[in-house]
């Protein structure tokens, strides 16, 4: 109910917003209490156990609360985030599917040399040569792996804003003529490097996007990945304004892939027909991707589900400021993260889908040593375990819901970290259809399969 269709777009009254905030905060607190109860650590102050909530192995940069200056055996650096919290970025931690790893904090900071060189408006990273314009947006980005210029049009991460007065429903609708009204906004107020080391560089900027509203943002470039992330805090005090972040790319392709539930949908990225023209605003979940045969750029986010795509341009919708029925509903502080990920291959599970999951699902951090046995894993890269839940009508059983994510055929083998008595294939209602002989499954493109695991 807290995700009801009148709550998500802001089309509810003020008291509902207030009640929902309290209820969600209470739900999150109870979830943390349950995690602490089910996964107790020994409380060792200088150690943490990291648990991977994903069904595939990961080795991306991990972010946890800093309890020391370094991490024993791993490249690391500390920084203060936009909330004023002291955090640590750690690289090189390999987490198996649903598995864990222990990290020990040290009093000695990592002394490895920085992988980045900033000279005026030019930034050199292990993956790209970047040039900033006077507003702090990325005017040029050359991929070192291909020598290719990626920017064509507005600089990457240009903020654009338009008047947003819908003809009918204030918070529900976006009218087609809004596209003609977008113009760059953002007066750069401050800009500084707040962290630079062997793991990443963080450039913190603050813009005024109007007389009343500001954006503060960390641009994060990584030594281990071509991804550029944007950790964003908006102080929003606008009415009937629509804000986007523009990424006008030099890619030439005839479609965009956008994630939906249990898969993705491919749409035209041109405006030739009336149907295509009506898709001036489309939806996505964790990613949208423009890919040629052997190169592409994914736009990844953690909570922003609307965007516009036209030829090589992707523009992520950051905020829509309707005033009815709650004129205060959108006012104040908003937090989000988004990123661009250039990849030197076409669209695949490894190039886009898995990094998008990693961006959205941070590992659980348990204080001290915690005894964690990996639940299960699947060996096909394009098969994802999307859900793990208790079985509705059986004790000593749980449900795995898996799906094929890339639009391809797959043979997949399940591996379990515990003894299994019986496996069966179920429908979505958990009604058994057949017993599973062994641990092998086949998947058609985007097929969802539900497995009952008895132990």
Task: Please name every model-derived segment.
Residues 1-39, 44-46, 355-359:
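Metal- or metallocofactor-binding catalytic centers and their adjacent structured scaffolds
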Residues 33, 37-455:
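C-terminal (or distal) subdomains of carbohydrate-active enzymes
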């Amino acid at each position: 109910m807290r995700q009801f269709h009148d709550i998500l777009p802001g089309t509810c009254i003020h008291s509902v917003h207030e009640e929902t905030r309290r209820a969600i905060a209470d739900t999150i607190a109870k979830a943390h209490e349950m995690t602490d109860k089910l996964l107790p650590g020994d409380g060792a102050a200088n150690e943490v156990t990291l648990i991977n909530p994903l069904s595939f192995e990961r080795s991306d940069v991990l972010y946890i609360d800093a309890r020391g200056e370094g991490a024993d055996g791993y490249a690391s650096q500390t920084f203060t985030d936009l909330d004023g919290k002291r955090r640590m970025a750690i690289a090189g931690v390999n987490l198996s599917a649903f598995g864990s790893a222990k990290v020990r904090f040290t009093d000695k900071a990592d002394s490895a040399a920085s992988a980045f060189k900033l000279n005026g408006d030019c930034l050199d990273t292990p993956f790209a040569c970047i040039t900033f314009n006077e507003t702090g947006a990325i005017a040029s980005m050359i991929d070192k792996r291909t020598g290719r210029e990626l920017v064509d049009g507005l600089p990457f991460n240009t903020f654009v804003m338009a008047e947003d007065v819908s003809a009918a429903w204030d918070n529900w609708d976006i009218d087609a003529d809004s596209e003609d009204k977008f113009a760059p906004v953002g007066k750069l107020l401050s800009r500084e490097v707040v962290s630079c080391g062997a793991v990443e560089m963080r450039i913190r900027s603050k813009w005024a996007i109007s007389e009343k509203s500001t954006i503060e943002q960390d641009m994060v470039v990584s030594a281990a990945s071509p991804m550029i992330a944007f950790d964003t805090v908006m102080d929003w005090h606008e009415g009937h304004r629509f804000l986007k972040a523009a990424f006008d790319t030099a890619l030439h392709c005839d479609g965009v892939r956008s994630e939906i539930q249990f898969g993705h949908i491919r749409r035209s990225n041109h405006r030739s027909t009336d149907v295509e023209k009506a898709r001036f605003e489309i939806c996505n979940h964790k990613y949208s991707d423009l890919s040629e045969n052997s190169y592409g750029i994914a736009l990844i986010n953690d909570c922003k589900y609307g965007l516009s795509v036209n030829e090589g341009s992707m523009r992520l919708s950051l905020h829509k400021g309707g005033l009815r029925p709650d004129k205060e509903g959108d006012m104040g502080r908003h937090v989000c993260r988004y990123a661009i990920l250039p990849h030197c291959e076409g669209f695949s599970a490894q190039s886009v889908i898995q990094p998008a999951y990693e961006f959205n699902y941070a590992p659980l951090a348990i204080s001290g040593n915690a005894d964690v046995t990996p639940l299960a894993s699947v060996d096909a890269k394009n098969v994802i375990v999307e859900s793990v839940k208790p079985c509705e009508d059986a004790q000593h059983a749980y449900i795995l819901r898996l799906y094929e994510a890339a639009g391809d055929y797959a043979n997949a083998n399940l591996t379990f970290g515990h003894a299994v008595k019986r496996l069966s294939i179920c429908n979505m209602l958990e009604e058994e259809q057949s017993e599973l002989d062994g641990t092998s499954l086949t998947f058609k493109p985007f097929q969802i399969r539900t497995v009952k695991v008895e132990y």
